[in-house]
């Protein structure tokens, strides 16, 4: 799967909006993930106790983790598909330490699209959404290949 230069530009244009408030976007995305797929919360020992959206919004740890997640993703997206060096340690930790199934990466991808659309409706139209979906699908495909190399059937 390859994105055109124009598609990558759409991805990076919306990502510039994310970078104005990485932690806030990350927190919103994690809240959307946990509300939509409560089973994903079980993978996070330090967040398991957060049961309500209000508790999640009040959690500085959740906000920090959202910042970490989106900072890593931003670094990958900026490589425009040439993300081997960034992907390898991420796949290693998510396969061997955290044991995060690929399905959960699909769930967070959906949460990313939803939050970007809700926060930036004028800047995240159908073309930008399609480009971001394609970029996230490329990321998932490549991380799934790394999982396979590591013997993780996530």
Curated annotation (Swiss-Prot):
Gene that this polypeptide is encoded by: MB
Record family assignment: Belongs to the globin family.
Alphabetized PROSITE patterns for the sequence: GLOBIN (PS01033)
Gene Ontology process terms (BP): removal of superoxide radicals
Residues where heme b binds: 94
InterPro entries referenced in this protein's UniProt entry, alphabetically: Globin (IPR000971), Globin-like_sf (IPR009050), Myoglobin (IPR002335)
Organism of provenance: Eschrichtius robustus
Domain spans labelled Globin: 2-148
Lineage of the species this protein comes from: Eukaryota, Metazoa, Chordata, Craniata, Vertebrata
Oligomer status and interactors: Monomeric.
Pfam families xref list: Globin
Protein name: Myoglobin
GO molecular function annotation: heme binding; metal ion binding; nitrite reductase activity; oxygen binding; oxygen carrier activity; peroxidase activity
Subcellular location per the Swiss-Prot or TrEMBL entry: Cytoplasm, Sarcoplasm
Record has Iron as a keyword: yes
């Amino acid at each position: 799967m390859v994105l055109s230069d124009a598609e990558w530009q759409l991805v990076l244009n919306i990502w510039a909006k994310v970078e104005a408030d990485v932690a806030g976007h990350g927190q919103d995305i994690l809240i959307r993930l946990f509300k939509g797929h409560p089973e994903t919360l079980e993978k996070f020992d330090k967040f398991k106790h957060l049961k309500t959206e209000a508790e999640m919004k009040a959690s500085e740890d959740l906000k920090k983790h959202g910042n970490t997640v989106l900072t890593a993703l931003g670094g990958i997206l900026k490589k425009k598909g040439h993300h081997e060096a960034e992907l390898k340690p991420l796949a290693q930790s998510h396969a061997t330490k955290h044991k995060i199934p690929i399905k959960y990466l699909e769930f967070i991808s959906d949460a990313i699209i939803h939050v970007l659309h809700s926060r930036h409706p004028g800047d995240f139209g159908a073309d930008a959404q399609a480009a971001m979906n394609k970029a996230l699908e490329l990321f998932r495909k490549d991380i799934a290949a790394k999982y396979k190399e590591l013997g993780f059937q996530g």
